[in-house]
Amino acid sequence: MAFSLEYCAEMLSKARVRHHVDVEGNVIRVVFVTRHYRNIRGEKLAIAQIAAPDDGRRCRVTIERAFAPGQDAAATCLALCRAASDTPLVGVEFDAECENLRLVAEAVVEDGGLTRRQLLSMVDSVVEAAEAWQVAVVPRDGRAAA
């Protein structure tokens, strides 16, 4: 059984998680109010996207443009990779063409399934990583990490 966004939306509804299914974008978005994390617009919001790439053989949860790369994108990526090394399940990806620094959690589903608990754990892990890693990118003094 491949993973589908319809199945994912059903699981989120059963867990009473408010979400938006973007049919055109082929993703589900879940918005969280955060304690410390600020998105690149300065809002205390994390927008997690759930996708089912490879014909539903994987479940992928991301926060796109999670952090601004800053003047030194390599240093920012390195700081986040160091933070990721201590965090199970969550990684960092950088798309230099569009300067998209994203947080990502993926699970291989193949012909198995994904439980509601597993899905919620992936979403929670990405959002909690954004909260915790905020200081890796923007230290307490407010300046970008170098």
Protein language model features and the residues they cover:
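Short, highly charged C-terminal tails/helix-capping segments
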Residues: 137-146
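Long, contiguous binding/interaction regions
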Residues: 127-132, 136
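Charge-rich, low-complexity N-terminal segments
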Residues: 1-45
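A short acidic/glycine-rich loop-to-helix N-cap element
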Residues: 109-122
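Long, continuous compositionally biased terminal/linker segments
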Residues: 33-68
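Short, internal acidic amphipathic alpha-helical interface segments
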Residues: 57-100
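Short, aliphatic-rich beta-strand segments
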Residues: 101-105
